[in-house]
Design a protein with these regions (language model features):
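C-terminal alpha-helix plus adjacent terminal tail
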Residues: 1-9, 43, 56, 67, ...
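Terminal peptide-recognition signature
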Residues: 14, 18, 32-33, 51, ...
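An acidic, glycine-rich surface segment that forms the CoA-thioester-binding/catalytic face
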Residues: 30-38, 42, 65-108, 140, ...
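Short, active-site-adjacent cap segments at secondary-structure transitions
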Residues: 56-60, 66, 112
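Conserved catalytic-core motifs of eukaryotic protein kinase domains, centered on the activation segment
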Residues: 61-62, 130
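Crotonase-fold acyl-CoA enzyme core
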Residues: 94-208, 234, 241-242, 246-247, ...
C-alpha cells in the first residue's frame, strides 16, 4: 500500500510510502488516503493523527504527473483527453473534508507542490533539518490546486507568499520556522519521536474539547468577530454538557489525572 495507516493507541500515523517518485501521489492513492482519513475521523479510539513520508528525502511532492495525465496536446497532434486515471474524491484533506481531529505534519524532506499543500492543511507542522518547502506548480505551467494559493497567504506575510507562489521559490526548514510555518525544527532522527511526543501532549487533553476547539478555529476564521464569538459560545455550551468536562472538573477537585473518553 502506498499510504500506510497505522493505529498506535490513540494516535493514527499516515505514511506516504512511494519513495521511488519522492512520495508523489496518484489520484487513486489520494482516494485511498481519503478513505483512511474518514476511518480516522469516525474511530472514537483515535484522537490525533500524524502525517509523514517514507525515507529521509521526501515528505511528499504532490500529484504524480505520470499518472495524473494532462490537458496539453500530444506531440504533432491535436488536444486530446487526459490519460485515464481514477478520479480523486470530491472531498479530501486539502479541500472539503470536515476533520476536527488534529493532524501533525512531520515533514521529513521535500514538501513541494501538493506535498507542501498537504502540510499546510495540517494543524501543526514539525520539520526535519533537511526539509524543504515550495509551491513549485508555476514552474510546470500550473497553479496550486490543493489550497496553496489560499492557505499560504493566510499564514505568512503576503509578499513572502507571493514570492513562493509567483516565482516557485523554495525555502529551507529554518526559514519556514522563521515564518511560523513550522513549529519546531529537529534532526531527522528525532522527527517522529518529537511528533509522537506532541501528539501525546494533545492526547493528555480532553479529546472532545480539542476537536471542538479546532472546529471553532476552522469555522470561525472566515467569520466576523461577532459571529465567531457566537459560534464559540454555541460550541462551548456543548462541551460544558459533556462527560469529559464533568470528569475534568472532578479530577481537578480530587487532584488526580482525568480519564477522558471523548464524550
Amino acid at each position: 500500500m502506498t499510504i500506510e495507516y497505522k493505529k498506535e493507541e490513540k494516535i493514527a500515523v499516515f505514511t506516504i510510502n512511494n519513495p521511488d517518485v519522492l512520495n508523489a501521489l496518484s489520484p487513486a492513492e489520494v482516494a485511498e488516503w481519503t478513505a483512511n482519513l474518514i476511518d480516522f475521523r469516525e474511530d472514537k479510539n483515535l484522537w490525533v493523527g500524524i502525517v509523514t513520508g517514507a525515507g529521509e528525502k521526501a515528505f511528499c511532492t504532490g500529484l504524480n504527473l505520470r499518472t495524473a495525465g494532462g490537458g496539453g496536446p500530444p506531440p504533432g497532434g491535436q488536444r486530446g483527453p487526459a490519460p485515464s486515471a481514477p478520479p480523486a474524491p470530491q472531498e479530501t484533506l486539502v479541500k472539503g473534508l470536515k476533520l476536527w481531529k488534529p493532524l501533525i505534519a512531520a515533514v521529513n524532506g521535500y514538501a513541494f507542490g501538493g506535498g507542501f499543500e498537504i502540510a499546510l492543511a495540517c494543524d501543526i507542522r514539525l520539520a526535519a533539518e533537511n526539509a524543504r518547502f515550495g509551491l513549485t506548480e508555476v514552474t510546470l505551467g500550473l497553479i496550486p490546486g490543493w489550497g496553496g494559493s489560499q492557505r499560504l497567504p493566510r499564514m505568512i506575510p503576503f509578499g513572502k507568499a507571493a514570492e513562493m507562489l509567483l516565482m516557485g521559490k523554495r525555502i529551507d526548514a529554518q526559514e519556514a520556522f522563521n515564518l511560523n510555518l513550522v513549529s519546531k525544527v529537529v534532526p531527522q532522527k528525532d522527527l517522529m519521536a518529537t511528533a509522537k511526543e506532541w501528539a501525546n501532549q494533545i492526547c493528555n487533553c480532553a479529546p472532545l474539547a480539542v476537536w471542538t476547539a479546532k472546529e471553532a478555529m476552522m469555522r470561525g476564521i472566515d467569520m466576523t468577530l461577532a459571529d465567531g464569538l457566537n459560534l464559540e459560545g454555541e460550541l462551548g455550551r456543548k462541551v460544558m454538557a459533556s462527560k469529559d468536562f464533568a470528569e475534568g472538573r472532578k479530577a481537578f477537585m480530587e487532584k488526580r489525572t482525568p480519564n477522558y473518553i471523548g464524550e
